[in-house]
């Protein structure tokens, strides 16, 4: 990860379905990377980072011939913890996986959720990406300095929206911005949304003064001129986008987000290894490499126990950072 401050050390896509149990009985012989009946859950609404990641991964895996007919579904609620609870309840289901990231880590803490990521089977961390600071195209703020100047005058009157619960990336990034600008984080009027899709409607509808979310979520809207990009939160500019890093603009912020995949608890070693092998083959495919480039994602691949250790460390960092910010 590229985070240089405690906040920056924290970086978060899954499908939603309400109805019958998620257990699937896909037919066919399972060979190689084929997992008949595989389902990807997205724990927030359509259009967010988890959703884009899951649907991109499913399409790329199918296009590469790694497996077929992956179902992607959304189960939003409580920052991803509703989906997490459902995943944990599917004990031993080797045909289910959930797209997730730092947002779920934070939501577990902010919602005091009974189920945590320690109750899942870690599969892989896939990507890392910068957050973007955006406003609607008709916003009065043309630069990051203009926005921060108005924000400092009265933080409570300038609501900032994010697609994650407190403790998630879209919450921590503006808190880091506030701290760097001399604004007390506790004075920030942060409005959480259940994913970038919901947040986008509020930015375009002027329900929030500005929004913070992953670059891949709003790339199309930025290029189409629907959103004005003021800055990016990571260590370098994003190729193809005309916006400074926060550090270039004079704010000591270096923050990146991440996303990965977890599975239910209770998988056999063979089931876990098969799902991991599928994701490894996906990661190595030209289809996935092209999708990472198109979405502005950086490779952050990590599997198995190493990913499990990373999740534990992220949880500790979320607790530490929220305490540091007085939140």
Task: Describe each PLM feature range.
Residues 5, 20-119, 183-197, 201-209, ...:
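N-terminal (or domain-start) structured segment
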Residues 8-21:
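Hydrophobic membrane-insertion alpha-helices, especially the h-region
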Residues 9-10, 245, 270-327:
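An extracytoplasmic/periplasmic, membrane-proximal ligand-sensing/linker region
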Residues 35, 60-64, 86-95, 108-194, ...:
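Hinge/capping helix and adjacent helix->loop/strand transition within the periplasmic-binding protein
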Residues 81-93, 151-153, 176, 180, ...:
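Short helices/loops that flank or line small-molecule/ion binding pockets
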Residues 93-100, 160, 209-213, 228-231, ...:
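Paired acidic/hydrophobic, glycine-rich loop segments that form the ligand-binding mouth/hinge
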Residues 98-104, 195-196, 212-218, 232-235, ...:
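Beta->alpha turn/N-cap motifs
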Residues 217-284, 313-316:
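C-terminal lobe and pocket-closing loops
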């Amino acid at each position: 990860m590229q985070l240089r401050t405690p906040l920056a050390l924290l970086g978060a896509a899954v499908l939603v379905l309400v109805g019958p149990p998620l257990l699937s009985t896909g037919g066919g012989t399972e060979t190689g990377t084929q997992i008949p009946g595989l389902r990807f859950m997205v724990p927030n609404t359509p259009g967010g980072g988890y959703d884009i990641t899951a649907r991109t991964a499913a399409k790329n895996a199918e296009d590469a011939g790694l497996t077929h007919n992956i179902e992607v579904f959304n189960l939003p609620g409580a920052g991803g913890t509703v989906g997490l609870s459902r995943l944990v309840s599917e004990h031993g289901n080797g045909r289910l996986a959930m797209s997730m990231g730092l947002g779920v880590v934070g939501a577990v803490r902010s919602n005091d959720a009974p189920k945590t990521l320690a109750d899942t089977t870690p599969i892989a961390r896939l990507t890392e990406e910068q957050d973007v600071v955006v406003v609607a195209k008709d916003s009065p703020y043309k630069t990051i300095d203009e926005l921060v100047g108005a924000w400092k005058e009265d933080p409570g009157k300038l609501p900032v929206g994010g697609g994650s619960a407190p403790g998630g990336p879209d919450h921590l990034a503006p808190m880091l911005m506030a701290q760097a600008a001399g604004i007390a984080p506790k004075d920030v009027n942060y409005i959480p949304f259940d994913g970038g899709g919901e947040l986008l409607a509020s930015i375009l509808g002027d329900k929030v003064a500005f929004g913070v979310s992953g670059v891949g979520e709003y790339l199309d809207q930025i290029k189409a001129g629907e959103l004005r990009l003021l800055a990016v939160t990571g260590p370098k500019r994003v190729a193809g986008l005309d916006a400074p890093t926060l550090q270039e603009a004079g704010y000591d912020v270096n923050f990146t987000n991440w996303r990965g995949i977890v599975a239910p608890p209770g998988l056999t070693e063979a089931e876990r290894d098969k799902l991991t092998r599928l994701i490894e083959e996906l990661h190595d495919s030209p289809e996935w490499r092209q999708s990472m480039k198109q979405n502005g994602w950086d490779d952050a691949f990590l599997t198995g126990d190493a990913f499990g250790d990373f999740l534990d460390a992220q949880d500790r960092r979320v607790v530490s950072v929220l305490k540091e910010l007085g939140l």
